[in-house]
Amino acid sequence: MTQQTMSFQAEVKQLLHLMIHSLYSNKEIFLRELVSNASDAADKLRFEALENNALYESDPNLRIRLSFDKAARTITIDDNGIGMSRDEAIANLGTIARSGTKEFFSKLSGDQQKDAALIGQFGVGFYSGFIVADRITVETRRAGLPASEGVRWESAGEGDFQVDTIERAARGTTITLHLREGEDELLSSYRLKSIVQKYSDHVALPILMKKEEWDQEKGEMVEKDEDETINQASALWTRAKSEVTDEQYKQFYQHVAHDHQDPLAWTHNRVEGRSEYTQLLFVPSHAPFDLWNRDYRGGLKLYVKRVFIMDDAEQLLPQYLRFIKGVVDSSDLPLNVSREILQESRDVKAIREGVTKRALSMLEELANAEDDAGKEKYKTFWSAFGQVLKEGIGEDHANRERVAKLLRFASTHGDTDAQDVALADYVARMKPEQTKIYYVTADTWQAAKNSPHLEVFRKKGVEVLLLTDRVDEWMLSFLHEFDGKPLASVARGDLDLGALNDDEKKAQEETGEAMKPVVDKMKETLGEKVKDVRVTFRLTDSPSCLVADDNDMSGYLQRMLKAAGQSAPSFQPILEINPEHPLVKALKADGADFGDWCHLLFDQALLAEGGALEDPASFVKRTNALLLSRAA
């Protein structure tokens, strides 16, 4: 086939411009990305060769070779991995097939350090070569194809690329970077080695360079016809913990998670017994951009006896821990394991249970840290992943108690929206006569904090948790108690503060009897709007509030379901009135404006809890009429 000249996809042109003009100060990343791609190519070959050993073509020793040519001003990265066919070269090097292209550009922050890390995360690392090169030549042949089906791909990064069919005996890919002016400092064995050791020391494949020795006569380093391995070349998780430095763990995390930031914590151990496996797990310091996407694929990298099997093996972790990154290397699973087999395997179930326990232990260690740095780390974790962790209350019955101890909430104990109160902290501060853990749900912290339902709790100095995450109502349908103390909504049912409100209860019964004519007339006036009307002692400043019956859906949950486009039963609340409030005291069952006052008290209560009025115009008209009558 003759040479073809083709145009880059529009997004690639934009990306090339970014690489060349915006990321220059962090140019070392080009080598990290190209070595990482070479490592992936070797993993893919190993995986495909499980079913077709002939793909090794009598060259089973996988490696990456790095070289440079001072005279030609080139750097070459060569691998004997899976290689590419002509169609694959065009698809992989000329277009970005991922749906995340737009997200990639929207995430660019202008911070070169952060933006550089996004490159690997979005699978566009190859183009980082243009940071230092004004021309890139790729020669490749896919394993299993004849030598006559080699491919040469070349581009100057200016919108077009050329593809040609060539004769290539060797399997794999050779990338040659033709350096830009001013990049000659990279043409040094020492410089290239230092970049590899900084970013790619953990790569399980040997990275080879020609050995150099000092030549006394020439007064310079001279290349020898002998290879040396310039990285550790062993899978980091297979080493003893004592042999791995914190810096190496951090670099490995950045490689495996495609993340530029350090992890908050990690755990590394080998499990022996019924199932034998090694796990190296990390807690990231921030959430990925697509964590809440429906098609987000979390999970760990799965290896079997050090052979890479798959990315995103979500069967190894429950959904609520999908943010955990890392590697599991099993000694028991078959090498031809598929995602379908993973779902049915007993060994996988045992691994999943073990990984879950280990991940929770890691989070418990973070949560229970007593030093300021440790506490700050858990705050960072909670801010990024707290809402995801709450899913575990409903998903993981076996570990529900452990997950509950990790939860954090805002509360009336502090005057900020910081979610830093553990359920154990709340229980430790409970009043001697208090038997329940009280909470209120709302759309915002401000709405929760100012909820009229909290008035009696403030009066009595009883702490209330302020729950404002969308997942909270769902979570509470599974979290019924903690440490033997039931959780109770301050906006549901007939409020019972136990011994804390004996006097008020007695007074409420007496007042309720005295106000029965007014209450009955209000119920008749409001009709289907309310399930009931009753006198309450839970209010001290507000004239009225709405509460849900014990077995009914709350107004907050109903609004949330509607916002999500789901059907929800109509909300028929109980209207509670404060008999000590002047507006309620002024109510007269036989008054001409009694109906207007009833509707006003209902509408005010609905607004106070974050609800929406069905007929705002009537509310305004009614309010104006009552104001005018008072003014007169």
Curated annotation (Swiss-Prot):
SUPFAM superfamilies: ATPase domain of HSP90 chaperone/DNA topoisomerase II/histidine kinase (SSF55874), HSP90 C-terminal domain (SSF110942), Ribosomal protein S5 domain 2-like (SSF54211). It is found in: Cytoplasm. Residues 340-559 are annotated as: B. One of its GO terms (molecular function) is unfolded protein binding. One of its GO terms (cellular component) is cytoplasm. Molecular chaperone. Has ATPase activity. This is Chaperone protein HtpG.
